[in-house]
C-alpha cells in the first residue's frame, strides 16, 4: 500500500479446507480467512485517504486439486475432487472473507475453469444467503506459450466460460512473464466488456528459483499494455516487490485506463476452443446424444459411471459432424 497499490490481496491463496488438509489445518480455515481479511482491511482503512481509497480483495486460489483432469493416466475418468467438494470448500472460504469485511473477491490463478465455476457458484450462494454482494474479479493463468490453461482452454474459451457472471474484471496472472502474456491479454481486451487485469510474474524463475526482472524492466513491459489501452488493472505476481508496485503506480498515473468496447450480442460457446455464432456462420450442427434427458442410453451410461462409453458417444457425435455437443 505504501508503494502505491490501490488493491491488496488477503494472504488466503490456499485458504480452503482442500488445500489446508495437507497440513491437518482444516479446522483453522475460517480463522485464516477471517483474520487475514480483518488485518488487511484495518491497514487499508488506516492508509486510505479521500483522494486515494484503498481496497482489500479476498484471494481465492485454485486449490491443489483439479476437477477436470485425471491424475491417473490409466484412468482418464478418475478425479481427486468433485464439483460439490470444491463448492463446499469455497463457500466456507467466501463466508469467512466476507465476515472479515473484504471489498471484493478475487478468484485467481485459474488453471481449471471447472474449479473456477465451483468458486463462482459458491460465491453466488453466499451472496444470496447473506443478502450481500461485492465485486468479483477472475484471473486465469496461461500455463505456457501454447496459449492454453492447464486444463486446455484458450484465452477466448476461458472468457466465454465465465462471462455469464457479471464480473468486475477478467485477466491473467502468474505463469508467464509480461511480454509472453501480452497476446492473451490483448485477446481478452478485444473480446470482453469487463475490465481487464494483468499481474504477471517478474519473468520466469531462474535455476535458483528466483526472479530476475527488475521493477524497471517489468515497468517498461507493462507500460506497453497501458499505452496500447489493453488494461484497466495492473499489478505483480510471483517475484514482484514493493519496488515493482511503486514503478507500476508511477507509470500508470500517466495513462488513461482501457476504454470498454461495445460488442455485438452473439452466441458465444466454449469447450477447449471458443465458438462464436455470427450472422455469417454456416449452419451449426448440435449433437444431442450426450444429454441425459434426451438419451436413455447416455443416461444409463452416466448412472453406471461408464464414462469411457459415454465419451465414445460424444466422440461419435463429433465425428458425425457436430460442432457443439449438448
Outline where the language-model segments fall.
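Domain-level signal for soluble alpha/beta catalytic cores
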Residues: 1-326
Amino acid at each position: 500500500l505504501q508503494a502505491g497499490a490501490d488493491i491488496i490481496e488477503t494472504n488466503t491463496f490456499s485458504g480452503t479446507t482442500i488445500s489446508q488438509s495437507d497440513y491437518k489445518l482444516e479446522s483453522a480455515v475460517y480463522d485464516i480467512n477471517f483474520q487475514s481479511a480483518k488485518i488487511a482491511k484495518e491497514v487499508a482503512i488506516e492508509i486510505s485517504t479521500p483522494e486515494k481509497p484503498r481496497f482489500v480483495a479476498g484471494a481465492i486460489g485454485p486449490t491443489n486439486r483439479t476437477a477436470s483432469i485425471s491424475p491417473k493416466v490409466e484412468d482418464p475418468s478418475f478425479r481427486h475432487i468433485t464439483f460439490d467438494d470444491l463448492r463446499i470448500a469455497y463457500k466456507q472460504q467466501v463466508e469467512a472473507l466476507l465476515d472479515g469485511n473484504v471489498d471484493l473477491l478475487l478468484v485467481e490463478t485459474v488453471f481449471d475453469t471447472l474449479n473456477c465455476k465451483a468458486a463462482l457458484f459458491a460465491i453466488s450462494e453466499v451472496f444470496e444467503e447473506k443478502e450481500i454482494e461485492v465485486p468479483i474479479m477472475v484471473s486465469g493463468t496461461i500455463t505456457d506459450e501454447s496459449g492454453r490453461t492447464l486444463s486446455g482452454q484458450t484465452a477466448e474459451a476461458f472468457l466465454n466460460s465465465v462471462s455469464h457472471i457479471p464480473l468486475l474484471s477478467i485477466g491473467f496472472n502468474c505463469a508467464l512473464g509480461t511480454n509472453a502474456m501480452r497476446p492473451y491479454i490483448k485477446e481478452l481486451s478485444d473480446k470482453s466488456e469487463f475490465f481487464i487485469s494483468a499481474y504477471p510474474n517478474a519473468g520466469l524463475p531462474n535455476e535458483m528459483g528466483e526472479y530476475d526482472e527488475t521493477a524497471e524492466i517489468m515497468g517498461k513491459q507493462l507500460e506497453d499494455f497501458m499505452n496500447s489501452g489493453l488494461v484497466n488493472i495492473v499489478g505483480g505476481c510471483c517475484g514482484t516487490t514493493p519496488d515493482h508496485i511503486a514503478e507500476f503506480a508511477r507509470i500508470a498515473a500517466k495513462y488513461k485506463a482501457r476504454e470498454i468496447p461495445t460488442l455485438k450480442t452473439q452466441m458465444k460457446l466454449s469447450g477447449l476452443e471458443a465458438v462464436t455464432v455470427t450472422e455469417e456462420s454456416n449452419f451449426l450442427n448440435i449433437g444431442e446424444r450426450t444429454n441425459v434427458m434426451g438419451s436413455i442410453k447416455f443416461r444409463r451410461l452416466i448412472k453406471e459411471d461408464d464414462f469411457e462409453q459415454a465419451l465414445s458417444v460424444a466422440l461419435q457425435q463429433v465425428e458425425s459432424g457436430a460442432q457443439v455437443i449438448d
